[in-house]
Structure formats: C-alpha cells, structure tokens
C-alpha cells in the first residue's frame, strides 16, 4: 500500500476542482455565450502529471 503525500493530495484536489463544469449562473449572465470550458479533462483520455 502506498501512502499519498500531502503535496500530491493537494495537487489531485486542485485538479478535481478545476475539472468542474461552468456554473449555471455564468451561462445565464453571458446569455449562453459561455457554455463549456476547453480545459475539461476526462479521466480516461488524459492523465495527470502529479
């Protein structure tokens, strides 16, 4: 069993936070000009370098 170091845990949680969708209030505010963000990451397609 490997233990995650604190730095790696922080980087993984940052990557999880960055991987969320665009908030609905942003879509409303921009009149659906912004509906997705191009830096969305799929867990299967791309790997993290942490």
Swiss-Prot record:
InterPro entries reported in the protein's UniProt record: Ribosomal_eL39 (IPR000077), Ribosomal_eL39_dom_sf (IPR023626)
One family from Pfam that matches here is Ribosomal_L39
Disulphide bridges, residue numbers? none
Return one GO MF term.
structural constituent of ribosome
Q: What SUPFAM superfamilies has UniProt attached to this entry?
A: Ribosomal protein L39e (SSF48662)
Ribosomal protein as UniProt keyword: yes
The superkingdom listed in its UniProt entry is: Archaea
Biological process (GO), any one = translation
Of which family is this protein a member?
Belongs to the eukaryotic ribosomal protein eL39 family.
Q: What is this protein called?
A: Large ribosomal subunit protein eL39
Q: What is the gene called? A: rpl39e
């Amino acid at each position: 069993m490997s233990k995650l170091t604190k730095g790696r845990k922080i980087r993984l949680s940052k990557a999880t936070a960055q991987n969320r969708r665009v908030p609905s209030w942003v879509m409303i505010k921009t009149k659906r000009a912004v509906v997705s963000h191009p830096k969305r990451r799929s867990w299967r397609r791309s790997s993290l370098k942490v």
